[in-house]
């Protein structure tokens, strides 16, 4: 069962301060399906026990601290994600007359560049609040055992590459980056096994390894993660390619093109690591060869009665 920290009565008035640009006419029923979808997505990032606790406190109407702060951050993140998910339905009208857009004397639809910017801001702001929520939970572990003991948190802190690495090498923002790390955690572990452990039986993270991993992860994430789960550098690259092609190309083709840029850079860095490994192996072989005794040395004297050559 999907549980979300919202209720139908008074939704627009209560949630207006929590989401930028929300019109009072935007009622719960308008975006319920997207709220539920986002609720299901969030449950794959945060433990269900924590979500249940916050939802129960919200529905009871008396959320104490620190639950009230965590609940506020969660609602803000979910609202921005939900409006992003529902945006096309808010722009268009589907009826027996077909698919139309709303236009009257007072209002008209936004231009494409405006909706593109809106999508990016909705995702970026949602990431911001998810980041604050994760940080808040980590700062109050004693108050939130549902989070402290969760598999999600353990998996996050066991990742071999951290957010600072992604910020340094591929520009993933520190503000909101925790959400990307949790969404892409399985890809990070996959790359570490496929590309690092296959080269180094007992690997130790270095700048060269971290850089290669970050580019490889970004390339794979571009193809496998939802657009809203991708960091801003990738979203901008995809949007730029969309603009060049005016959507004449399929979305998958464009994602493959952007992915290929990251994977090509990653391959360069993996090749450099392979050369370094080969160089060390050759140096070791030379060292071992110098330590071995010479074989086949002839040491004959006149007292030898005979010998074979």
What do these predicted regions represent?
Residues 1-76, 85, 89-214, 218-309:
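Conserved short "hinge" loops at termini or chain/domain junctions
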């Amino acid at each position: 069962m999907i549980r979300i920290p919202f209720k139908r009565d008074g939704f627009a008035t209560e949630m207006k301060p929590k989401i930028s640009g929300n019109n009072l006419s935007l009622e719960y029923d308008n975006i319920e399906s997207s709220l539920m979808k986002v609720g299901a997505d969030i449950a794959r990032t945060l433990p269900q026990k924590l979500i249940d606790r916050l939802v129960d406190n919200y529905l009871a109407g008396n959320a104490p601290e620190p639950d009230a702060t965590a609940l506020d951050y969660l609602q803000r993140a979910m609202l921005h994600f939900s409006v992003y998910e529902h945006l096309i339905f808010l722009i268009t009208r589907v009826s027996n007359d077909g698919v139309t857009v709303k236009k009257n004397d007072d209002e008209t639809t936004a231009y494409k560049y405006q909706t593109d910017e809106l999508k990016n801001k909705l995702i970026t702001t949602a990431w911001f609040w998810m980041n604050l929520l994760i940080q808040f939970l980590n700062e109050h572990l004693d108050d939130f055992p549902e989070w402290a003991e969760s598999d999600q948190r353990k998996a996050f802190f066991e990742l071999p590459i951290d957010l600072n690495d992604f910020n340094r090498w591929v520009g993933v923002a520190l503000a909101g980056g925790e959400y990307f790390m949790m969404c892409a955690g399985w890809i990070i572990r996959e790359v570490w096994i496929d590309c690092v452990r296959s080269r180094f039986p007992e690997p130790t993270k270095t700048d060269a390894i971290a850089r290669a991993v970050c580019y490889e992860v970004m390339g794979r994430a571009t193809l496998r993660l939802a657009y809203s789960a991708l960091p801003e550098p990738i979203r901008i690259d995809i949007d730029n390619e969309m603009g060049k092609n005016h959507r004449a190309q399929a979305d998958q083709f464009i994602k493959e093109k952007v992915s290929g840029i990251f994977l090509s850079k990653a391959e360069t860095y993996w090749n450099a690591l392979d050369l370094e490994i080969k160089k060390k192996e050759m140096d070791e072989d030379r060292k071992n060869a110098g330590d071995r005794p010479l074989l086949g040395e002839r040491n004959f004297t006149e007292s030898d009665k005979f010998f074979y050559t």
